[in-house]
């Protein structure tokens, strides 16, 4: 240990300037000295910077209200689902932030989320927008492509590979990402009774997903596909990955209705019919998911269930026009680049919405309807300098007339004849 000569003049810390008799220790280097207090301070600074680097994406965690405000900019309606998601996601990342030395014995467990709603109700968009809000890696998987290990199809580890790829192979980032698994209802057991036949895309897949949902160190093939002996693997801890599971769960209303009917004493079971579809879904319970075909262990790992409502004409019209990246704004901008104004009448917006409801595609089908309507316009207009404005009417959407084309003076330059 370094010792100072007694006749040597009083030494000072080269960083804070304190004399050696003012501190407990003074460590000497090549012409410099540092005291124990400065060493402790430097150590704290390094630890803080390391902590910031490992949780860079969530250092400034938005509040549930801020998360919901951001969701409102891109997702129309579904207020209850957005509130449930905002609280669940906030609590999830708050839990990650507090990981480290425990001051007490309370351990915060992860709560994955299930989104139940019809096709086109906004399940995928909600999950995508959440990931953007929090600046974390995001991956989408389809449960119908998954099978048990040893059968043709994707292993569940391939879901993790997509997240790793979204994080540019930064494992630390991937371990704090979000994975959305769609069509989760399609891996429900075919009946509540176990069967001697193999259900390679049902209960077996639930068991495989269960491992990564609850938190495990998974071995992921870097090139995807099946695992092979002697293959180099990527190791990833799924403990802090948030899983959002989505599904339409067609027919689950009947399951809920049966449960409610059984509990109505002194009334006929038809009494449960007074509930409309949305009111029924609002009363969904874990036992309903089990009756539908999800195993109890799987349900236990997804404690938060948010119900999304079927979108009506008004909601679909709002989706077309109100969000920051609304479809009408996108196509208007597209034609604007060719110096052409695009206008949809109110009746046209209603017709688009009604057609999406007819097709049972919800918001997901809006883009294809607009694309079908505008394909000829987007083909012809760039080579027709006379056109400065295009008006889309309800008749255009219903394929009764062509879009109305106008020149710079406001003159109609096509006759809007009934389409052949």
Curated annotation (Swiss-Prot):
Gene3D superfamilies referenced in this protein's UniProt entry, alphabetically: 1.10.8.60, ClpX chaperone, C4-type zinc finger domain, P-loop containing nucleotide triphosphate hydrolases
Transmembrane segments: none
Keywords, alphabetical: ATP-binding, Chaperone, Metal-binding, Nucleotide-binding, Zinc
Annotated Pfam families: AAA_2 (PF07724), ClpB_D2-small (PF10431), zf-C4_ClpX (PF06689)
Keyword ATP-binding included in the entry's annotation: yes
GO molecular function: ATP binding; ATP hydrolysis activity; ATP-dependent protein folding chaperone; protein dimerization activity; unfolded protein binding; zinc ion binding
Assigned GO CC terms: HslUV protease complex
Binding site for Zn(2+): 13, 16, 35, 38
InterPro entries noted in UniProt: AAA+_ATPase (IPR003593), ATP-dep_Clp_protease_ClpX (IPR050052), ATPase_AAA_core (IPR003959), Clp_ATPase_C (IPR019489), Clp_protease_ATP-bd_su_ClpX (IPR004487), ClpX_bact (IPR046425), P-loop_NTPase (IPR027417), Znf_CppX_C4 (IPR010603)
Superkingdom in the source lineage: Bacteria
Binding site for ATP: 118-125
Single Gene Ontology BP annotation: proteolysis involved in protein catabolic process
KW RNA-binding (keyword) present: no
PROSITE patterns, per the entry: CLPX_ZB
Domain ClpX-type ZB: 1-54
Function comment: ATP-dependent specificity component of the Clp protease. It directs the protease to specific substrates. Can perform chaperone functions in the absence of ClpP.
Family, per entry: Belongs to the ClpX chaperone family.
Subunit structure: Component of the ClpX-ClpP complex. Forms a hexameric ring that, in the presence of ATP, binds to fourteen ClpP subunits assembled into a disk-like structure with a central cavity, resembling the structure of eukaryotic proteasomes.
Protein name: ATP-dependent Clp protease ATP-binding subunit ClpX
């Amino acid at each position: 240990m370094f010792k100072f000569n007694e006749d040597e003049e009083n030494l000072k810390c080269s960083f804070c300037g304190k004399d050696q008799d003012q501190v407990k220790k003074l460590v000497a280097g090549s012409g410099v000295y540092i005291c124990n207090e400065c060493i402790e301070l430097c150590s704290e600074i390094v630890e803080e910077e390391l902590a910031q680097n490992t949780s860079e994406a969530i250092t400034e965690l938005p509040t549930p209200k801020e998360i919901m405000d951001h969701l409102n900019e891109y997702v129309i309606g579904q207020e209850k689902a957005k509130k449930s998601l905002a609280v669940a996601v906030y609590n999830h990342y708050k839990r990650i932030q507090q990981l480290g030395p425990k001051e007490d014995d309370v351990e915060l467990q992860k709560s994955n989320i299930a989104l139940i709603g019809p096709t086109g109700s906004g399940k995928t968009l909600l999950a995508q927008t959440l990931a953007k809000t929090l600046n974390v890696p995001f991956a989408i998987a389809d449960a119908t492509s998954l099978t048990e290990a040893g059968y043709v199809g994707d292993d569940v580890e391939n879901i993790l590979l997509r997240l790793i790829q979204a994080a540019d192979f930064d494992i630390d980032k991937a371990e704090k990402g979000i994975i959305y698994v769609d069509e989760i209802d399609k891996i429900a057991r075919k009946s509540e009774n176990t069967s001697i036949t193999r259900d390679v895309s049902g209960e077996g897949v639930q068991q495989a997903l269960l491992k990564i949902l609850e938190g495990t160190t998974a071995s992921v093939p870097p090139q995807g596909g099946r695992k092979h002996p002697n293959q180099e693997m990527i190791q990833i801890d799924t403990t802090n990955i948030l899983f959002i599971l989505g599904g339409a769960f067609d027919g689950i209303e009947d399951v809920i209705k049966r449960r409610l009917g059984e509990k109505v004493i002194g009334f006929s079971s038809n009494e449960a019919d007074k509930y409309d579809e949305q009111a029924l879904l609002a009363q969904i319970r874990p036992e309903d998911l089990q009756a539908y075909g999800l195993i109890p262990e799987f349900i236990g790992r997804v404690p938060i269930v948010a119900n999304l409502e079927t979108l009506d004409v008004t909601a679909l019209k709002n989706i077309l026009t109100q969000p920051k990246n609304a479809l009408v704004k996108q196509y208007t901008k597209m034609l604007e680049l060719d110096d052409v104004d695009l206008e949809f009448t109110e009746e046209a917006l209603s017709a688009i919405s009604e057609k999406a409801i007819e097709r049972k595609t919800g918001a997901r089908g809006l883009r294809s309807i607009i694309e079908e309507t505008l394909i000829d316009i987007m083909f012809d207009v760039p080579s027709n300098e006379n056109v400065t404005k295009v008006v889309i009417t309800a008749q255009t959407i219903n394929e009764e007339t062509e879009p109305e084309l106008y020149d710079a003076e406001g003159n109609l330059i096509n006759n809007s004849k009934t389409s052949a």
